[in-house]
């Protein structure tokens, strides 16, 4: 079974490669393929990293307040 780190790396690599890059100075912005909204690759990478609990590996991501808190004890 693949480790969480290798799965995370593969997902992030796939997302980075799926971004259509444009030349600097072009009036267009980078867009995720198949979408019309102008979003840079950083937001998609940060969302994925924060969801997987790996946001600390990317200094440009701010995952504060995005973590789901799971308690190991049951409420009585």
UniProtKB/Swiss-Prot annotation:
Expressed by the venom duct. Residues 1-27 form the signal peptide. Keywords: Acetylcholine receptor inhibiting toxin, Amidation, Disulfide bond, Ion channel impairing toxin, Neurotoxin, Postsynaptic neurotoxin, Potassium channel impairing toxin, Secreted, Signal, Toxin, Voltage-gated potassium channel impairing toxin. The modification Asparagine amide is found at residue 64. Disulfide bonds join 46-61, 50-63. One of its GO terms (cellular component) is extracellular region. Residues 28-39, 65-76 form a propeptide. GO terms for molecular function: acetylcholine receptor inhibitor activity; potassium channel regulator activity; toxin activity. It is found in: Secreted. Its main location: secreted. It comes from the Eukaryota. Belongs to the conotoxin J superfamily. Highly inhibits both nicotinic acetylcholine receptors (neuronal (alpha-3/beta-4) and muscular (alpha-1/beta-1/epsilon/delta) subtypes) and the voltage-gated potassium channel Kv1.6/KCNA6 subtype. The cysteine framework is XIV (C-C-C-C). This is Alpha/kappa-conotoxin-like pl14.1.
